[in-house]
Regions:
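ATPase catalytic-site recognition across NTP-hydrolyzing enzymes
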Residues: 1-13
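Residue-level detector of short, conserved catalytic/binding motifs and their immediate flanks
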Residues: 7, 19, 84, 177
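Active-site beta-strand/loop microenvironment that shapes enzyme catalytic pockets
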Residues: 11-21
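Anionic group-transfer/hydrolysis microenvironments
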Residues: 12-14, 91, 180
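Short beta-strand scaffold segments in enzyme catalytic cores
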Residues: 19-25, 181
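Short loop/turn segments immediately following beta-strands, especially the blade-tip
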Residues: 26-31
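Mg2+-dependent endonuclease catalytic cores in nucleic-acid-processing enzymes, primarily RNase H-like
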Residues: 34-169, 190-191, 203-206, 215-223
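Acidic, Mg2+-coordinating catalytic module of metal-dependent nucleases/exonucleases
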Residues: 170-196
Length: 223
């Protein structure tokens, strides 16, 4: 991933439930070398190229990892890579959840893992993801690398909430989807409906499977 691309890190906190961190980059449309191949992504494409997922290996079961360890591991994985924006669930800024005089956000920041409040609008966030999948000029505006195994695993199992048809069923393993939503809202796109490709997300949460994800989102290799 080129150093000069706009990069965003997103975080969703969990203790008994999984936590998730995703790293994304916004393409400027230039050619890049991936695995010895020169390819380009449409300008403004969001490439999710790294994940850190705190689960036990069982769906919706978190590692019960403390914030300092999450922060240290996150920064180690990032390895001095510079982020342009870092967004997280606004709940970590809740003053009522202070521990030893610090909010969860302040505790993370103590170990170099700094975040600002994500735009947490749920319906608008899911629409941003759908817009990126719809894309422009026949090409999607979101890509996920094969290293992001848990995002690829959990994305197709999402379902609409039966009582809130514009929202997701929050009882499902939606933690990395929330992070993807935060990142998408940090760099929103506008899609011209008249020129958009047929919407592959019309039955998005109901009918997607991993094969369709690879077809519609172009899973790519990244080392």
């Amino acid at each position: 991933i080129p150093h000069d691309w706009y990069k965003i890190r997103g975080f969703d906190w969990g203790y008994s439930a999984p936590f998730g961190v995703l790293w994304g980059a916004i393409s400027d449309g230039s050619l890049i070398n991936i695995g010895g191949k020169h390819i380009s992504f449409p300008r403004d494409s969001l490439i999710i190229y790294r994940e850190y997922y705190g689960w036990t290996g069982k769906p919706n079961k978190g590692l019960k990892m403390e914030l300092p360890e999450i922060a240290k591991n996150t920064m180690q994985m990032q390895d001095n890579e510079v982020m342009n924006k870092q967004v997280a669930d606004p709940a970590i800024f809740d003053e009522s959840k202070k521990n030893m005089g610090m909010t969860q956000a302040e505790e993370l920041a103590k170990y170099g893992c700094i975040y600002e409040r994500a735009d947490n609008k749920r319906v608008a966030g899911w629409q941003q993801i759908r817009s990126r999948l719809t894309g422009r000029d026949g090409k999607p505006l979101i890509y996920i690398t094969e290293s992001c195994k848990n995002l690829i695993r959990t994305l197709p199992i999402m379902q609409y909430d039966k009582t809130k048809p514009e929202d997701l069923d929050t009882s499902l393993e939606d933690h990395l989807l929330d992070v993807l939503r935060y990142i998408s809202m940090a760099r929103p796109v506008t899609i011209d409906i008249k020129n958009a490709i047929p919407d592959p997300t019309r039955d998005f949460w109901d009918n997607f499977n991993p094969h369709q994800i690879r077809k519609n989102k172009k899973v790519i290799n990244y080392e």
